[in-house]
């Protein structure tokens, strides 16, 4: 764990310990559910200087110290040469906690500013350039896994962005093969809420570095979706949890993709399809009602 918790009051320390245990449990569960980290892995943790990647590194360090599975960690930061970037912050922090690290200097900032018109979203190109550099570094370091700091809210935002603007039911997977086909990319924070990570980063007093390249783009589509999800979370408790659960409860027979379900070959006599012609029921009927409905089918 980081150094911030020791400076808290007893009550704050109790809450911080509870939060750390919850996050560690969620990360451990995600790792187990998707077989993210295996014995002997060398995990390259991509550290941006933001709250999420700090929390990711801290929690993985905690799991490394207590888990039966033996794996290595190395932190990697890409210095994109953004104006005003405090180059000393990450090396000082990583040295202070005894974490092996590598700082990679690559001026992707100038490339993005040159190619993207003023006022347009830079995130897509910036991300593409950053991925290419990180894949190369993973090769150089002999990393078997690349760990990114995307969390539950990022996954939900991406789901809605694809739905609203891409015409796809698609989001960030917890584990994937990289674009170059040579690396396994993992997202151990997949089950963690952003607000929990923000609270944890504040409690641990991580030396946060703001992103000057894209952080001020308030009108970009992702920011609009983020704010919408935050409003839903306040107004409709449990909605985000249900949305996230739906990503683990897919029923191809009740969608419209014939590549996932054989609608052409659908025939009677093979038994009912799960949920049949029931499109949506907000909650199960009482047992007596279910029995009556069953009798009406006969």
From Swiss-Prot:
This enzyme's EC code(s): 2.8.1.-
Localization annotation: Cytoplasm
Cofactor annotation remark: Binds 1 [4Fe-4S] cluster per subunit. The cluster is chelated by three Cys residues, the fourth Fe has a free coordination site that may bind a sulfur atom transferred from the persulfide of IscS.
Tagged with keyword Magnesium: yes
Gene Ontology BP, a term: tRNA thio-modification
Reaction equations catalysed: cytidine(32) in tRNA + S-sulfanyl-L-cysteinyl-[cysteine desulfurase] + AH2 + ATP = 2-thiocytidine(32) in tRNA + L-cysteinyl-[cysteine desulfurase] + A + AMP + diphosphate + H(+)
The family this protein is said to belong to: Belongs to the TtcA family.
Quaternary context: Homodimer.
Reported function: Catalyzes the ATP-dependent 2-thiolation of cytidine in position 32 of tRNA, to form 2-thiocytidine (s(2)C32). The sulfur atoms are provided by the cysteine/cysteine desulfurase (IscS) system.
Protein name in the entry: tRNA-cytidine(32) 2-sulfurtransferase
Protein source organism: Nitrosospira multiformis (strain ATCC 25196 / NCIMB 11849 / C 71)
Name of the gene this protein is made from: ttcA
């Amino acid at each position: 764990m980081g150094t911030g918790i020791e400076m808290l009051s007893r009550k704050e320390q109790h809450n911080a310990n509870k939060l750390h245990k919850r996050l560690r449990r969620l990360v451990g569960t995600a790792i187990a559910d998707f077989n993210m980290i295996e014995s002997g892995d060398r995990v390259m943790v991509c550290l941006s200087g933001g709250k999420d990647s700090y929390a990711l590194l801290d929690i993985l360090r905690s799991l490394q110290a207590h888990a039966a599975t033996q794996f290595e960690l190395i932190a990697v930061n890409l210095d994109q040469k953004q104006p005003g970037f405090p180059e000393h912050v990450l090396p000082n922090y990583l040295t202070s906690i005894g974490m092996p690290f590598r700082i990679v200097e690559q001026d992707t900032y100038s490339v993005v500013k040159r190619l993207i018109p003023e006022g347009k979203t830079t995130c897509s190109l910036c991300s593409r350039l950053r991925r290419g550099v990180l894949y190369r570094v993973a090769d150089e370091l002999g990393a078997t896994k690349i760990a990114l700091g995307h969390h539950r809210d990022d996954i939900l935002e991406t789901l809605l962005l694809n739905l609203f603007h891409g015409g796809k039911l698609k989001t960030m997977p917890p584990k994937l093969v990289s674009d170059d086909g040579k690396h396994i990319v993992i997202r151990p924070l997949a089950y963690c809420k952003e607000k929990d990570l923000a609270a944890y980063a504040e409690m641990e007093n991580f030396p946060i570095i703001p992103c000057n390249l894209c952080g001020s783009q308030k009108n970009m589509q992702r920011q609009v979706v983020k704010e919408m999800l935050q409003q839903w979370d306040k107004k409709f408790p449990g909605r985000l949890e249900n949305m996230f659960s739906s990503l683990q409860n897919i029923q191809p027979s009740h969608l419209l993709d014939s590549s996932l379900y054989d609608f052409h070959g659908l025939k009677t006599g093979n038994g009912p399809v799960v949920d049949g012609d029931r499109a949506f029921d907000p909650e199960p009927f009482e047992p007596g009602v279910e029995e009556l409905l069953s009798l009406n089918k006969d």
